[in-house]
From Swiss-Prot:
Monomer. The gene is apaH. This is Bis(5'-nucleosyl)-tetraphosphatase [symmetrical]. PANTHER family: CYTOCHROME C5, PTHR40942. Hydrolyzes diadenosine 5',5'''-P1,P4-tetraphosphate to yield ADP. Co(2+) is a strong stimulator (100-fold increase in rate of hydrolysis). Mn(2+), Cd(2+), Ni(2+), Mg(2+) and Ca(2+) are weak stimulators; the two latter act synergistically with Co(2+). It comes from the Bacteria. One of its GO terms (molecular function) is phosphatase activity. Transmembrane segments: none annotated. Gene3D superfamilies: 3.60.21.10. Keywords: Hydrolase. GO terms for cellular component: cytoplasm. GO terms for biological process: nucleobase-containing small molecule interconversion; response to X-ray; RNA decapping. NCBIfam families: apaH, PRK00166.1. It comes from Escherichia coli (strain K12).
Amino acid sequence: MATYLIGDVHGCYDELIALLHKVEFTPGKDTLWLTGDLVARGPGSLDVLRYVKSLGDSVRLVLGNHDLHLLAVFAGISRNKPKDRLTPLLEAPDADELLNWLRRQPLLQIDEEKKLVMAHAGITPQWDLQTAKECARDVEAVLSSDSYPFFLDAMYGDMPNNWSPELRGLGRLRFITNAFTRMRFCFPNGQLDMYSKESPEEAPAPLKPWFAIPGPVAEEYSIAFGHWASLEGKGTPEGIYALDTGCCWGGTLTCLRWEDKQYFVQPSNRHKDLGEAAAS
């Protein structure tokens, strides 16, 4: 009985299935953890959602920013961008079923026995675990309610960017959403910077990756996250696992088997496309 953690799939269905075959993943016996951003950019978002949903209790996932954007498109709030390749999913006969299932998925996964936490972008150093749990529940409750389009319409924006227990209403929900799904860099006090997307070596001072700022969750738990493909899975402290390795950009899809910390990778099929283009 193994636990497999896989980074951002981004619609790369064929690579996901190949990787699961490589590690001999067995639903019902093994458990699959997914860092979110199941959809967009790759060609198989519909197949990814259908497959992941079919796994039932054998999968534990968290929502990413692209998953939330898909929900906003589905609700008629955001524009369907051709580069996201979401039209087959949005026009599928089971789209309502899939997307209503998706919006009821969590922002945070915790395994107390393994001392393991997963969130798409990570855990802000301004939160302890109890605060993270409460904040995740706040957004999850709205997403699973009938008023979820109202929240999705208001979630876009970079402010507020500093946590306070006094935050209320849509500002509170927006900060929580950004912390769980968009965060990369912070100021030394933990305040979010929502503009920089480069690698840590290229970031302007005084910005630091969120995981480079001491926080109470990382003192007691391992943290697995995706979202940040330019890290290429490297440069994190012990106990912090960056799993997005840019499959949809021609990189790889990465899997970590938790029990022995062994990594497995599946090259992106885009390598074939790029190679064929270069040869032609």
